[in-house]
């Protein structure tokens, strides 16, 4: 009898044990902690509102209270906020593909050819193909070497124009310049030449038509960055997209049309030139490359038509290269002016390794370790994309033990991560030496060290990081070699930041410059 009871209960006990074991192995849908104060319908939106609010700083303060992974409800969408390098590593390694998409936003629709600009495009075959083409045909090391003359000549032209201004003003006393605007024109010139073979600013006069195009291009790029950083109701509440409460979408559509006119003109001019040259034309710039690919039918299988593919990819490159480099150089020079001993150290390094009888060249940069450290430290303190770009989960995944559902948006607070006191001593101080002999001497900026990733990491990292670093290194070295620089009455530089997609300096960088080299080196 006992044996019969035992044989009856054993299978039942085994079944119960297996069921309990399976239940314990099921993934727990643990949600990241959410800040208190969420309101019905709008969620946490009111905590992030404010015209002059710096979102990366606000989110950084929240992270101090709620931890390195937070969940915010912004209208009808969930947003997962990352604020530590450990959580970022989890996102950009094991979960990189799951988090590789972009959300559809009003800015991307109205100004980005219905999300075709690859920096804002959702994860798709189209995004992969456009990114690959841009990388191979403009941003690869081979192509950058071929286009080196464009970068070098534009940097040289700025030095020449600044010197000419000094001569024009009398050639004896330091002359005041708004350096920020000069650097912005230099970067826009550089990208427009690489993409479309045109030059807008400095070095001679333009036809009235080109002068107006230059003005519209500068205005369009500025408006794009302003509008893409603005909150629109439809981004938080897609069902209300039909009603433009704030008028921002109207502005976006207008900016999109203005930029489209310029891009259309570039393409048409290239088509006419190709007709004239017949089969003898060469792919001298990116528009030519894209037209050749279109003629070969390379875009026929993709989501967008050939012309949209060309326009959107050209726009992506112009936007990516024209804003970030001048912003970083502006911050670097501002930091040096507020730390004059470091400014002198940088100029002394150039004088020792290069001298004053020739201009700094690319080949000199490897010996200018302090210049390299200054750029790294500037990118650490003022990353051009402090929150990288919004990502969106294309499938359910687990990040740092928290469940992230499909459709959840993600923000990575690089600004906060790169000021982590566990990693950096005196994290809010400007100390380039930390990248030479200090705690960060092994860190690189290419996305392999998650403690320092100003260009992002993983599939969505910036494909133009090599070009950016070349411009930053040579641009800073040439400027510091060419000019002595100081502020008016030796006053500290105002380091106030302005809201936006990047970290714009709120005020102009008005400085006094005077030449350090002999006249022949500016010509």
UniProtKB/Swiss-Prot annotation:
Origin: domain of life: Eukaryota
Q: How does it sit in the membrane?
A: Single-pass membrane protein
Q: Which EC main class describes this enzyme? A: oxidoreductase
Please list the cofactors this protein needs: heme
Question: Knockout: what is the outcome?
Answer: Increased susceptibility to virulent Pseudomonas syringae.
Q: Where do the TM regions start and end?
A: 1-21
UniProt xrefs under SUPFAM superfamilies: Cytochrome P450
Enzyme Commission designation = 1.14.14.-, 1.14.14.165
Any idea where this protein resides? Membrane
Its family remark reads: Belongs to the cytochrome P450 family.
Q: What Pfam families does this protein map onto?
A: p450
Which GO CC terms are listed, alphabetically? membrane
Q: Which GO terms describe its biological process?
A: cellular response to hypoxia; defense response
Give an example GO molecular function. Answer: indole-3-carbonyl nitrile 4-hydroxylase activity
The protein in question is named Xanthotoxin 5-hydroxylase CYP82C2
**InterPro entries associated with the record:** Cyt_P450, Cyt_P450_CS, Cyt_P450_E_grp-I, Cyt_P450_sf, Plant_Cytochrome_P450_Monoox
What does this protein do, in the record's words?
Answer: Involved in the biosynthetic pathway to 4-hydroxyindole-3-carbonyl nitrile (4-OH-ICN), a cyanogenic metabolite required for inducible pathogen defense. Converts indole-3-carbonyl nitrile (ICN) into 4-OH-ICN. Can hydroxylate xanthotoxin (8-methoxypsoralen) to form 5-hydroxyxanthotoxin (5-hydroxy-8-methoxypsoralen) in vivo and in vitro.
Q: Please name the source species.
A: Arabidopsis thaliana (Mouse-ear cress)
Which residues are recorded as binding heme? 462
Keyword annotations of the record = Heme, Iron, Membrane, Metal-binding, Monooxygenase, Oxidoreductase, Transmembrane, Transmembrane helix
An additional note in the Swiss-Prot or TrEMBL entry is: Plants overexpressing CYP82C2, can hydroxylate and subsequently glycosylate 8-methoxypsoralen.
Q: What induces it?
A: Up-regulated upon pathogen infection.
């Amino acid at each position: 009898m006992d044996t019969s009871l035992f044989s009856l209960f054993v299978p039942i006990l085994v079944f119960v044990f297996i069921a309990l074991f399976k239940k314990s192995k099921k993934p727990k849908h643990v949600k990241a902690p959410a800040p208190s104060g969420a309101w019905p319908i709008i969620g946490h939106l009111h905590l992030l509102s404010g015209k002059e609010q710096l979102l990366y700083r606000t989110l950084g303060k929240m992270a101090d209270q709620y931890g390195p992974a937070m969940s915010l409800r912004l209208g009808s969408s969930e947003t997962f906020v990352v604020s530590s390098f450990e959580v970022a590593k989890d996102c950009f390694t094991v979960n990189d593909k799951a988090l590789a998409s972009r959300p559809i936003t009003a800015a991307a629709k109205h100004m980005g050819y219905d999300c075709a600009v690859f920096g804002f495009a959702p994860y798709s075959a189209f995004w992969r193909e456009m990114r690959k083409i841009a990388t191979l045909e403009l941003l690869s090391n081979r192509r950058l070497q071929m286009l080196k003359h464009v970068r070098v000549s534009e940097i040289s032209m700025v030095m020449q124009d600044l010197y000419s201004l000094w001569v024009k003003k009398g050639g004896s006393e330091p002359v005041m310049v708004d350096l920020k605007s000069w650097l912005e024109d230099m970067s826009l010139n550089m990208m427009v030449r690489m993409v479309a073979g045109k030059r807008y600013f400095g070095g001679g006069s333009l036809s009235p038509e080109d002068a107006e195009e230059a003005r519209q291009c500068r205005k369009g790029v500025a408006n794009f960055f302003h509008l893409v950083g603005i909150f629109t109701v439809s981004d938080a509440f897609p069902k209300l997209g039909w009603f433009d409460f704030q008028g921002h979408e109207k502005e976006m559509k207008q900016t999109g049309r203005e930029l489209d006119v310029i891009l259309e003109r570039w393409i048409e001019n290239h088509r006419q030139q190709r007709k004239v040259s017949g089969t003898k034309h060469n792919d001298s710039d990116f528009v030519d490359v894209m037209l050749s690919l279109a003629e070969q039918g390379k875009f026929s299988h993709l989501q967008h038509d050939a012309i949209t593919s060309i326009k959107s990819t050209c726009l992506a490159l112009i936007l990516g290269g024209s804003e970030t480099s001048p912003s970083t150089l502006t911050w670097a020079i501002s930091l040096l002016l507020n730390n004059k001993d470091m400014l002198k150290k940088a100029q002394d390094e150039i004088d020792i390794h290069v001298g004053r009888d020739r201009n700094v060249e690319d080949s000199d940069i490897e010996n200018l370790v302090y210049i390299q450290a200054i750029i790294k430290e500037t990118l650490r303190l003022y990353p051009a994309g402090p929150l990288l770009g919004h990502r969106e989960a294309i499938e359910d995944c687990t990040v740092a033990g928290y469940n992230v559902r499909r459709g959840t948006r993600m923000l990575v607070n690089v600004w906060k991560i790169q000021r982590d006191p566990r990693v950096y001593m005196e994290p809010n101080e400007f100390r380039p030496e930390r990248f030479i002999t200090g705690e960060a001497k092994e860190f690189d900026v290419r996305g392999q060290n998650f403690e320092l990733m100003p260009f992002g990491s993983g599939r969505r990292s910036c494909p133009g990081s090599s070009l950016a670093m070349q411009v930053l290194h040579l641009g800073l070295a040439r400027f510091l070699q060419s000019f002595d620089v100081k502020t008016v009455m030796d006053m500290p530089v105002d380091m106030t930041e302005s809201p936006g997609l990047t970290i714009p300096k709120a005020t102009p960088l008005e400085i006094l410059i005077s030449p350090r080299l002999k006249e022949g080196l500016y010509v």
